[in-house]
Amino acid sequence: MCIRDSKLAQHSLELTKQIREKYSFNYDHSSLGTMKIFRDESSFDKASREVERLSNLGLSFKVLTNQEAVEQEPFLSDVSEKLSGGIIFPDDESGDAYKFCKELEKVIREKGGRIHVNTEVKKILFNKRKVNSVVTDRVEIKASRVVLTSGSWTNNLLKNTRLNLPVKPVKGYSLTLDTSILNDTPKMPIIDEGIHTAFTPLGYSLRVAGTAEFAGFNDDIHQKRIDYLYKTLESIYPTISANLDLDKGALWYGFRPMSPDGMPYIGPTKLSGLFVNTGHGHSGWTLAMGSGDVLADLMLKKQPKIEVKPFLASRAV
């Protein structure tokens, strides 16, 4: 998290809590916080200074020695001597993004929203530079306002507009392992800053996510990336790695929509009625609810609840 998007992340977290409590969402969520760990003094000292700057923006954290980090997450005891320290963020939450979306889908349908599944959007039609309709492979939908939330594929729908968002796909992998056979498992999400990998407990599973591959939309699964995830698991949780059936890990990959400055594009474009909400990179769910709220305010010409200038789509389109 950087200073520019910390307010958006905090706003998003609060809205996520409100939605969860209001509709009793179940998505293996945890409110135990998250912890970053560091394996060298230089990166640990640098990160400690950076979070001090964020504290002025309301970010809660605590800098930990390696032993204090183990006290927070005992499963780190196997690697305690390799750690320089950690930083815990007690207000952070985690959960299964897919399950959250399924819960959200139910609420949307219950409130009269329509979701067209297995439907490909072909193009957006305009009349005198104003949105007129959306053409799909099944039906044409009349609309005066359209929001593009198509991630790394956003520019595919901008081809006939002369607009171009500098959003590029960055391929990321995750590996989800069944931990139901274990008597005990880690409780807190751990981010190993040195190897840019996150280890997140999700109910009776442990998800290992990391790597960044700049290869366009190439959907080949590279074995070395998978091997890397297994290797990182062994490097942080050797006991768990030795007791799980690693051959049954569920592999996933996706294309994160990255912007050049790392900030999302939210809001209106130069074409009347056309809005975008994309470019969130690896922070998609972290910023999701806040981004949606900001976008709704902009569409309704209301004052957003946070400063939005750094995120406005108008800086690109």
Where are these regions (language model features)?
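Short loop/edge segments at beta-strand edges and connector loops
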Residues: T65, V117-T119, A250
